């Protein structure tokens, strides 16, 4: 079949920041980046020069590197960002309690056009680390280390109907640590989470670092964590993604069994393949015939 074509490694002009970016999303030719930083500067500018103030969120043109005026503000780190299906709204999650100087308990929404606040009926009592919009655009999944959303019990994962702005009945019980990533199957049949959690509702096979749920929140009993077991204080599934071929996961581990990229079957949880390279893996992206990974892999 030959080698599939990939994007090049050619450098593009990219805006710089004075801190760290934890997540980003691309809408059209605009990159929206969030994390913990207070200033942004043009590509090529040394640190401290030509800086413009930002408060943990910024945007730039992916082709030219031009910094845009989009500049929502928060009083704490933003860990996650997701775009609505139409690209007009951006959802933010993190450690903050204010968004654009108004109360926002660790999750909120802003307009992609100007960064002004948009309505979102959600508030979390603990850190939000993951956000994901369903393929049909109707549901926002929220993951992290919280135990309540809108004063209703939700153990580290929840789902919000974006039409009604109400919580759905999706309420798995993640027993400890946190949820780091969430994705819904492309056909809408199931939801997967990855993180540092060691069990789900008392089950660790499946339920250790990665788990697949029915749409009603019940745990799909399969082999998802029978082979790869990385969770707890020093291991985590950092990213889960989906396409028509399966469920992809990337992990890091100091004490677990795997720190590469793998693809699983949504129904059985069986592993289709594992890229068993040593070196922590932080993100994975299936793109047609190619799967990209962000890692410091070695010894492949």
What does each of the following model-derived ranges do?
Residues 1-300:
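Extracytoplasmic surface signature
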């Amino acid at each position: 079949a030959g080698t599939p074509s990939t994007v090049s490694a050619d450098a593009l002009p990219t805006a710089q920041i004075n801190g760290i970016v934890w997540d980003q999303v691309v809408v059209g030719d605009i990159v929206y980046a969030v994390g913990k930083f207070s200033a942004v500067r043009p590509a090529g500018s040394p640190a401290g020069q030509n800086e413009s103030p930002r408060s943990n969120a910024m945007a730039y043109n992916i082709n030219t590197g031009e910094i845009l005026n989009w500049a929502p503000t928060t009083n704490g780190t933003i860990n996650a960002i997701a775009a609505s299906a139409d690209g007009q709204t951006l959802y933010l999650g993190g450690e903050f309690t204010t968004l654009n100087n108004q109360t926002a308990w660790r999750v909120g929404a802003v307009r992609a056009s100007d960064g002004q606040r948009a309505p979102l009926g959600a508030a979390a009592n603990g850190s939000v680390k993951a956000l994901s919009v369903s393929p049909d655009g109707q549901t926002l999944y929220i993951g992290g280390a919280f135990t309540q959303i809108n004063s209703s019990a939700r153990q580290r994962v929840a789902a919000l109907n974006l039409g009604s702005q109400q919580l759905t009945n999706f309420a798995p019980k993640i027993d400890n640590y946190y949820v780091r990533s969430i994705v819904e199957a492309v056909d809408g049949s199931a939801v997967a989470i990855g993180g540092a959690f060691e069990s789900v509702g008392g089950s660790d096979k499946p339920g250790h670092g990665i788990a697949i749920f029915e749409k009603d929140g019940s745990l799909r009993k399969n082999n998802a964590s029978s082979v790869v077991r990385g969770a707890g204080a020093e291991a985590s599934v950092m990213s889960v993604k989906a396409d028509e071929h399966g469920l992809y996961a990337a992990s890091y581990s100091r004490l677990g069994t795997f720190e590469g990229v793998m693809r699983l079957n949504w129904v059985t949880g069986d592993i289709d393949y594992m890229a068993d390279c040593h070196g922590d893996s932080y993100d994975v992206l299936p793109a047609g015939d190619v799967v990209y990974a962000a890692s410091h892999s070695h010894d492949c």
